[in-house]
Amino acid sequence: VIACHSNDRRQQYCDAQVRRGVRLVRQESRSACVEGQTWGWDRRGIWVSNGCRAQFQVN
């Protein structure tokens, strides 16, 4: 499980070796964490934005 936090509503990348996907395990922010809008993943890892703070399971 990886914690990834958007501070000051800025986009933040969190390093992760993603093979099959990422699942949001627990949202820690009042700001919504919506896949494809305020969080997602790519070859660099997990990204969050607009105040999304959450814990993610990497598969």
Which role fits each region the language model picked out?
Residues 1-59:
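Extracellular, modular beta-sheet/disulfide-rich ectodomains of secreted and cell-surface proteins
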